Regions:
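Conserved catalytic-core motifs of GNAT/GCN5-like acyltransferases
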Residues: 29-36
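N-terminal low-complexity or amphipathic/hydrophobic leaders
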Residues: 38-51
Length: 211
């Protein structure tokens, strides 16, 4: 089974702010997904292609405090400062059949494969102990779903599709080599420059670059 883009993630300081941003930018209203009790976050979800989805995520202000940092760098002070300016393309997640095999061969520390849940959904995801995103989100998180099937078919298709995932890195060849080792070099366009991630999407409002 070839590695695939499982989902892309936009972070927001507040979930309603993230949804308003996507409604204004893409012309769609993304419905509520659910609550992640293990990380005190909540999300909104929609399909962006076959077996591929889009997540808006934010800290859940009504959740209890954690004894560890939230995932996706949401407790990182640098991320918090960026989110003050509005929602951002935060990271991407790659679906694999054997998450431990990916961790074992990765030249970049990916974190621990945590067993997670939301409602009746269960999955394993790489999460560093300090909650950071490897290479500021350019190196993806990896996810393993039971039977290799993600839940995108349960989400609404609102006319938004992911066209390209675009990454810039000060050492693009290094990043390409990392991706080659991880067998994901076919999933993203890499160019040289300051670290950044963006999602090129086709939407009801036309072509949009979320960054």
């Amino acid at each position: 089974m070839k590695s695939v883009i499982d989902h892309i993630v936009v972070g927001a300081a507040h979930l309603d702010e993230g949804c308003a941003f996507i409604e204004e930018t893409c012309g769609v209203t993304v419905p509520f997904g659910g609550i992640h009790e293990q990380f005190s976050t909540h999300n909104c979800l929609m399909q962006v292609g076959q077996e591929r989805y889009f997540e808006i995520i934010a800290a859940n202000p009504d959740a209890p405090s954690l004894n560890r940092p939230r995932w996706f760098s949401l407790d990182d002070e640098g991320t918090k400062r960026r989110l003050v300016g509005g929602p951002i393309a935060l990271c991407w997640v790659v679906g694999v059949p054997d998450i431990q095999a990916v961790i074992d061969k990765s030249p970049v520390p990916l974190g621990t494969p945590l067993s997670l849940y939301r409602g009746d959904l269960q999955w394993k995801l790489t999460v560093p102990d300090d909650g950071h995103l490897p290479e500021a989100g350019l190196v993806p998180a990896f996810i393993e779903w039971p039977d290799g099937v993600n839940p995108s078919s349960r989400m609404p298709a609102l006319g938004v599709t992911l066209d390209r995932l675009c990454l810039t890195h000060p050492e693009p060849q290094w990043l390409e080599d990392v991706f080659g080792t991880l067998d994901i070099e076919h999933l993203a366009d890499i160019t040289g420059g300051k670290r950044s991630i963006s999602f090129a999407c086709d939407t009801p409002k036309g072509k949009v670059l979320l960054r």
